[in-house]
């Protein structure tokens, strides 16, 4: 699973479409969030979109590269969170729905 944040609905939609079209993700969930962070020595607060990207661990490098190339931020949050365990039929579907998983 990969987590990323974007600052606009337009950038969100571009990233989602590209990841799904390229079969780099089986599912992407989005949440409207408020982010609080330090940037260039200043405390900032902005509305963002959180992307929860369901993918396989072995596709992370491709997912990261795709997001990096499409992202509107200079330094994008792109982090992988391991899926330790899960409902087997769901994990099978995730595998079958992504690149080279079929």
Tell me what each language-model feature is.
Residues 1-102:
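Positively charged, small/polar-rich N-terminal and surface patches that mediate targeting and assembly
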